[in-house]
Amino acid sequence: MAVALNIADLAEHAIDAVPDRVAVICGDEQLTYAQLEDKANRLAHHLIDQGVQKDDKVGLYCRNRIEIVIAMLGIVKAGAILVNVNFRYVEGELRYLFDNSDMVALVHERRYADRVANVLPDTPHVRTILVVEDGSDQDYRRYGGVEFYSAIAAGSPERDFGERSADAIYLLYTGGTTGFPKGVMWRHEDIYRVLFGGTDFATGEFVKDEYDLAKAAAANPPMIRYPIPPMIHGATQSATWMALFSGQTTVLAPEFNADEVWRTIHKHKVNLLFFTGDAMARPLVDALVKGNDYDLSSLFLLASTAALFSPSIKEKLLELLPNRVITDSIGSSETGFGGTSVVAAGQAHGGGPRVRIDHRTVVLDDDGNEVKPGSGMRGVIAKKGNIPVGYYKDEKKTAETFRTINGVRYAIPGDYAQVEEDGTVTMLGRGSVSINSGGEKVYPEEVEAALKGHPDVFDALVVGVPDPRYGQQVAAVVQARPGCRPSLAELDSFVRSEIAGYKVPRSLWFVDEVKRSPAGKPDYRWAKEQTEARPADDVHAGHVTSGG
């Protein structure tokens, strides 16, 4: 009897096909598929024994490491729903996420125990807490935390979880339009089709049989995949699940270090490298330019999976690593994979963020009609077919993003684009307002709210300014209260208690009055012009920003 397209089932097919193959490597540690199965089963049973029920939410608050893969698989085996927790979040953001997700259990690294201890009194529904040792000494027993391996040791290693459903929910938390995280709800079958390997991205056709990937795994040696970004990103979750379903090997590292990346590729003979645009590509190039004795002959694909990276960096990578393929992929937590641009040695490629979209992705104008190639019209990227159910506990935002137009249901998260004459699509950005800093989305309204909490700030707008490494950096245009002129260092210290560090402004412009519409709506075009007209009045130490 066919098994539903459930993530746990798909992983178990590969486990059965290649039990002795290495599934995951991190540093000097590694697990075979059979060992991963044993530990994930034990975790699943432990969660169930602690009262975690089907569709309960379990947070995962860790950097990349072996235990994060055990936890991902164990959570879905238990029938629970994984909640990805950004380890950069400060306490206010954690409190919101724990509460909004209705989290009942948490797996976290010990280094975050103090933050967790401060948040738990306001989130009493988080009852079961497993702590992964990481060499730090923060006290987790004060709130009932239990060491990860001690907790799962008593769990059953058996795979006896009953039937599963393709309609089970997979939750991807992403920043909302106000900056607050929103949980995007996917059916397991749908996210498998668009993000986790259930579609041949070259042809756009579905993988026909749920056992096909596992059968191919048994018949072929494994590819070695190395996703660099943290697992909090859907892109790295995607790369990891794809590898698990197809019996491949995933290499992880807890931190990004360019030299260590190349050493790891050399050591483990990595075939596919995944990263996030220029923020990672530039240091990787710099490390290669310095010269090395690494054997990188195994590497044939370099893929940017969360932020487009510049043509100059592609050119340099191809120069340093000839005969490789480089790809840019577009997509989002709301759409999954949407399209790609591919560049290999000797191939022509344009200078803009241009991709070829798949046949389930379109660009729609304001009237809901498809934008014609070469028309020069701007439209929004819209995805049909396998798309999310909606946002968790947010009917209003669900109705805004997931719309039915001419009888077709689309996911329209707000990414603007135009269609070129050859059918490729040039990306213009999310509402032309959000800031993409090294692959991290920053939404202006959240930063503005934090800034305006400072007693010396009357009003503020936040925009992105160009940055050679990160693509963009966060800049603030501030109207101070009369007689006040807060320094960037003061504002930095103040807002860090409200927002994660990567959202904090790196440059500051003062104006007599922030320009808004009569209805109070912000004029971001005007704010951007202020940053381009003259040098910043104050910049973060070590970061130089000038007009133009």
From Swiss-Prot:
Record's catalysed reaction(s): a medium-chain fatty acid + ATP + CoA = a medium-chain fatty acyl-CoA + AMP + diphosphate; a long-chain fatty acid + ATP + CoA = a long-chain fatty acyl-CoA + AMP + diphosphate; (25S)-3-oxocholest-4-en-26-oate + ATP + CoA = (25S)-3-oxocholest-4-en-26-oyl-CoA + AMP + diphosphate; hexanoate + ATP + CoA = hexanoyl-CoA + AMP + diphosphate
Gene Ontology biological process terms in this record: Actinobacterium-type cell wall biogenesis; cholesterol metabolic process; fatty acid biosynthetic process; lipid biosynthetic process
Assigned GO CC terms: peptidoglycan-based cell wall
UniProt pathway annotation: Lipid metabolism; fatty acid biosynthesis; Steroid metabolism; cholesterol metabolism
EC number(s) per entry: 6.2.1.2, 6.2.1.3, 6.2.1.42
Biased composition regions of type Basic and acidic residues, renumbered to the chain: 520-541
Organism superkingdom: Bacteria
Key words, A-Z: ATP-binding, Cholesterol metabolism, Fatty acid metabolism, Ligase, Lipid metabolism, Nucleotide-binding, Steroid metabolism, Sterol metabolism
Binding site for ATP: T174, G175, G176, T177, T178, G179, F180, P181, K182, D415, R430, K521
Pfam families cross-referenced by the UniProt entry: AMP-binding (PF00501), AMP-binding_C (PF13193)
GO MF annotation, one: decanoate-CoA ligase activity
Signal peptide: none
Region (Disordered): 520-548
SUPFAM superfamilies, per the entry: Acetyl-CoA synthetase-like (SSF56801)
PANTHER family: LONG-CHAIN-FATTY-ACID--COA LIGASE, NONRIBOSOMAL PEPTIDE SYNTHASE PES1 (EUROFUNG)-RELATED
Described function: Catalyzes the activation of medium/long-chain fatty acids as acyl-coenzyme A (acyl-CoA), which are then transferred to the multifunctional polyketide synthase (PKS) type III for further chain extension. Catalyzes the ATP-dependent CoA thioesterification of the sterol 3-oxocholest-4-en-26-oate to yield 3-oxocholest-4-en-26-oyl-CoA. It can also use 3beta-hydroxy-5-cholesten-26-oate.
Family: Belongs to the ATP-dependent AMP-binding enzyme family.
Name of this protein: Medium/long-chain-fatty-acid--CoA/3-oxocholest-4-en-26-oate--CoA ligase
Annotated source species: Mycobacterium tuberculosis (strain ATCC 25618 / H37Rv)
Gene: fadD19
